[in-house]
Amino acid sequence: MTLHSPQPRWSREQIRTARLAPLVPLLQQRALQLSEQAAGNFLLPAYPGLIVKDSYWRWPERNLAGNAIDFFVQILGLSFHDAMRQITGP
């Protein structure tokens, strides 16, 4: 029998803070290459066409956009709980 540790319960404030987390430093911590463009936009060569600015990202070619949590879930494939852990730290 395998015991799983319970998933943490995240408060509304923790989720709000994670949504607004600046993406560029988080992506740099994960060693993702970023290319700075005009007006504070960054491109990720590993994801052609994806644009990051502040705590938001958009990928026009795929009709996707979102906040920091969405990036970790939709683009990097993490679960919500793993995304929250990555964004909020240990």
What are the roles of these predicted feature ranges?
Residues M1-P90:
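N-terminal structured subdomain of primase-like DNA metabolism proteins
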